[in-house]
Amino acid sequence: MKVELCSFSGYKIYPGHGRRYARTDGKVFQFLNAKCESAFLSKRNPRQINWTVLYRRKHKKGQSEEIQKKRTRRAVKFQRAITGASLADIMAKRNQKPEVRKAQREQAIRAAKEAKKAKQASKKTAMAAAKAPTKAAPKQKIVKPVKVSAPRVGGKR
């Protein structure tokens, strides 16, 4: 038993029922009844007609049993090692007392400042050494030989 689908309403058409409509371009449509056929021929949109399957699908009618509650993904905190530091090292640092951590931070800052000062001092000495030889040898002015030419002969120009 072959069951067709109505081209307009979307309902099943059982054998012995419905009408077939062949357009001049060769496309064939099956309609459940004259109501569907007349609605199709008057160019009505099945998505805007309440009783059609397309309307019910568009407006989500009659699907309440199938809908499951959407599960939201929850972010789970996970601790793992980072490159250059193992998990044990990270946990040890985290469990340190704040005073110890503060002292370590200050010591690191002090060391960085000292290194910066040393770098600047070495830079200063290098600059002073570079400047000294330039002052010792001043350049002498080159005297260009003046070309003595014969007196000009002629008029104004």
Curated annotation (Swiss-Prot):
Modified residues (Phosphothreonine): T83
Annotated compartments: Cytoplasm
Main location: cytoplasm
UniProt cross-references to Gene3D superfamilies, sorted A to Z: 6.10.250.1270, Ribosomal protein L24e
Cross-link Glycyl lysine isopeptide (Lys-Gly) (interchain with G-Cter in SUMO2) per UniProt, renumbered positions: K2, K27, K35, K147
Stretches with biased composition (Basic and acidic residues): 106-117
Record's GO cellular component terms: cytoplasm; cytosol; cytosolic large ribosomal subunit; cytosolic ribosome; endoplasmic reticulum; extracellular exosome; membrane; synapse
Gene Ontology molecular function terms on file: cadherin binding; mRNA binding; RNA binding; structural constituent of ribosome
InterPro entries: L24e/L24_sf, Ribosomal_eL24, Ribosomal_eL24-rel_N, Ribosomal_eL24_CS, TRASH_dom
Sites bearing N6-acetyllysine, chain numbering: K27, K77, K93
Keywords annotated in UniProt: Acetylation, ADP-ribosylation, Cytoplasm, Isopeptide bond, Phosphoprotein, Ribonucleoprotein, Ribosomal protein, Ubl conjugation
Residues bearing PTM N6-succinyllysine: K131
ADP-ribosyl glutamic acid sites (modified residues): E4
Residue numbers carrying Phosphoserine: S86, S149
Modification after translation: Mono-ADP-ribosylation at Glu-4 by PARP16 inhibits polysome assembly and mRNA loading, thereby inhibiting protein translation.
Cross-referenced CDD domains: Ribosomal_L24e_L24
Domain of life of the organism encoding this protein: Eukaryota
Subunit and interaction comment: Component of the large ribosomal subunit.
Known function: Component of the large ribosomal subunit. The ribosome is a large ribonucleoprotein complex responsible for the synthesis of proteins in the cell.
PANTHER family hit by this protein: 60S RIBOSOMAL PROTEIN L24, RIBOSOMAL PROTEIN L24
Family: Belongs to the eukaryotic ribosomal protein eL24 family.
Protein name, per record: Large ribosomal subunit protein eL24
Organism from which the protein derives: Homo sapiens (Human)
Gene: RPL24
